[in-house]
C-alpha cells in the first residue's frame, strides 16, 4: 500500500502540491489526470525518490520513504519500475542491454539467467528477437515497449508510468494501454499512470484522480469518475476550454 499524508512541494512561494492525501491499494491501477503543471509528474518523482517533498510523509509498504537515506531508498527502488515519458533508453546500448541494465546493477545473476529474463520480458511486450537492435532503429511505440520491458525486468511490485501514450498515434497508444493492463494482470503489481489520454485512462484504471492547483479534487472509481457532477471533472473529460479574454490588435 502507498499513502501520501499531507504532502507539500513548494519552491519559494510557488506551491506545486498542497497538503495532498492519497491512498493506493496493493494491486490497484490508479490513473492521475491534471492539466500541465498541476503536479502529476512531481508525484511520480516523489514516490520513486527522485525528489523529496517540502513536508509530509510518503508511506510505501509501511515505511516512510522520506526519512530514508539514498542507500536505504535504493533497496526500496528495486521493487519499483518506471516508464518515462520519452522512454529514457540508453542510446549507446542495444535493446537487450537496456532491458538487462537493472539486472546487472542490482543482482548477481549469471549472463545466461539475464539473457533468459531479457528474452522473456521482450516477448511479453511483443518484441521477441529485438535484443541486438539499437534505440535509433526503433519507432516511438517500440521504444515505449522496451522501456516497459526494462521496468518489469526485476519483477516490481509497483510500476509508474509517466505519459506512456505521449507522442503516439491512436493505434500504438491502444497497444500501450493493453500492455499496461496486461502487466498488472500478469504481475499483480500496483500501477500509477499519469496521462492526458482519456481513452487510455478509462481502459486501464481501477480509480481515477484529478489534480487541480496542487490538490486532488476528485478521486473515484472509473465509472463514478465518468459520471461525476464536479464541473471540472466533466470539463477535463470532454476537453472543454475555459473562457479567456483575448485582446486583438484592433481592441487595443
Model-inferred region functions:
Residues 48:
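Helix-to-loop junction immediately C-terminal to a conserved catalytic motif
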Residues 63-64, 111-129:
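Conserved ABC ATPase "signature" region
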Residues 134-138, 142:
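Conserved ABC ATPase signature
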Residues 153-157:
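A short, proline-enriched helix->beta-strand linker immediately N-terminal to the Walker B motif
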Residues 159-162:
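Catalytic Walker B motif of ABC-type/P-loop ATPase nucleotide-binding domains
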Residues 170-172:
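Helix N-cap at the start of a conserved alpha-helix in ABC-type nucleotide-binding domains
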Amino acid at each position: 500500500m502507498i499513502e501520501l499524508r499531507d504532502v507539500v512541494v513548494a519552491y519559494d512561494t510557488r506551491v506545486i502540491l498542497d497538503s495532498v492525501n492519497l491512498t493506493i491499494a496493493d494491486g490497484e491501477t490508479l490513473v492521475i489526470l491534471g492539466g500541465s503543471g498541476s503536479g502529476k509528474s512531481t508525484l511520480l518523482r516523489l514516490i520513486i525518490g527522485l525528489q523529496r517533498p517540502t513536508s509530509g510523509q510518503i508511506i510505501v509498504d509501511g515505511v516512510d520513504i522520506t526519512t530514508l537515506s539514498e542507500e536505504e531508498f535504493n533497496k526500496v527502488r528495486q521493487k519499483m519500475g518506471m516508464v518515462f515519458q520519452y522512454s529514457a533508453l540508453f542510446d549507446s546500448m542495444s535493446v537487450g542491454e537496456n532491458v538487462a541494465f537493472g539486472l546487472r546493477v542490482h543482482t548477481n545473476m549469471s549472463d545466461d539467467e539475464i539473457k533468459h529474463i531479457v528474452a522473456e520480458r521482450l516477448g511479453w511486450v511483443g518484441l521477441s528477437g529485438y535484443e541486438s537492435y539499437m534505440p535509433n532503429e526503433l519507432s516511438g511505440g517500440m521504444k515505449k515497449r522496451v522501456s516497459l520491458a526494462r521496468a518489469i525486468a526485476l519483477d516490481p511490485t509497483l510500476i509508474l508510468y509517466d505519459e506512456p501514450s505521449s507522442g503516439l498515434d491512436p493505434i500504438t497508444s491502444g497497444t500501450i494501454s493493453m500492455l499496461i493492463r496486461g502487466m498488472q494482470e500478469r504481475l499483480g503489481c500496483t500501477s500509477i499512470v499519469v496521462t492526458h489520454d482519456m481513452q487510455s485512462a478509462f481502459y486501464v484504471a481501477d480509480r481515477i484522480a484529478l489534480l487541480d492547483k496542487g490538490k486532488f479534487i476528485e478521486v473515484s472509481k472509473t465509472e463514478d469518475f465518468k459520471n461525476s457532477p464536479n464541473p471540472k471533472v466533466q470539463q477535463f473529460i470532454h476537453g472543454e476550454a475555459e473562457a479567456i479574454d483575448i485582446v486583438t490588435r484592433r481592441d487595443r
